[in-house]
């Protein structure tokens, strides 16, 4: 018995020693395969971000740090640009460093710039686009083990990396017509949660088209408009997830479940609002709130759909709560290796346009921008992501008057077309088109792998070439 115990102890010691040696060997191998950037070992660099800038820059710096740790078990330091300049720096965003002044590239949309100078590297991109720069930098220069990487000493302009999509994000600005998206050209209100932007972020997207929004009732309401975007069918006003014959029709959230993907429904409106309901229930009257609530609970149980709604906030501290909701939901749905479908609605553009309150409408477009930025950060760090922004309808007939001042001309929905902004592989299908709103969901479904989604008897998925 003692002999057996002794042999067992010897075996444990041998295995433990082998494990330690293997671990050391791996760490040594990883340290020797670390790349150099313009002749300087990666371990000599410090990451620097703009202390006075937007949070996107700090998050991009933290992303680079985390990827270096993951790839090489090397923990680079992060400092802000108020601290002493180091010998070799990776500069993230427009800092006070001299290299940032040298870079100062003219970029448009989702373009970003990279420059190397005197042993340091600088990355710049407008607002959240710095995330695309950080991802590109890591994938292009840091994943090549034992490589001698050279970065140009003149500024180079790049586009985000995209891959075949498995994640699909649909962002809906309720009531957001053309001039709601152009509101920054006419107004300049002080909003404490803005990025200081002077444009709707959709205009940074590479592909822009438009859609027609009429329902079978004529001018659409949000129920029929939401159903068109969710299910690919024209239906009557007040109908949620059902066709003209009151038959249930499959939504993109249900399609995601069938394809093994996760699904999420988000809105600043309560969950029983018309748009989130269009993506989660099949009911003949949008006003049946108790029935909608029960049906949504059943959808969560049956399909695993994450329904996260109801946050109408108007201050900087509270807006961050919306960002937290977005990040949390993205973390949950992206845990599925098959990908996800997620719909997010900014509901209050519509509500304030009904009230003809242009200042509040402006604030809601800014608030929508904040959410869009968070979704786009995710898309840049996860390039297998397709993002589309649109509206279910326009509200208020917002137009410039003869003096060039924006004015409401109505207090209800209008027949006006709405814009489509698209990003990711497949987004080019929407460039310059004027289509029926149902074709948006037809095309998203096709990109997900289902060519025959919705009612395509007249208007088909753009993947089939019918515009």
Region spans (language model):
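C-terminal motif of bacterial Sec signal peptides marking the signal peptidase cleavage site
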Residues: 20-23
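Active-site His/acidic residue clusters
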Residues: 273-281, 326-330, 337-374
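Bacterial N-terminal signal peptides that target proteins for export
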Residues: 1-9
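Solvent-exposed alpha-helical segments and adjacent loops
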Residues: 29-158
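Bacterial signal peptide processing site
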Residues: 25-27
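Metal-dependent active-site segment of extracytoplasmic phospho-/sulfohydrolases and closely related
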Residues: 13, 178, 368-402
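N-terminal catalytic scaffold of extracellular/periplasmic and nuclease hydrolases
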Residues: 155-311, 394-467
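Loop/turn elements at helix/coil->beta-strand transitions in domains of secreted/extracellular proteins
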Residues: 43-44, 74-75, 85-88, 164-169, ...
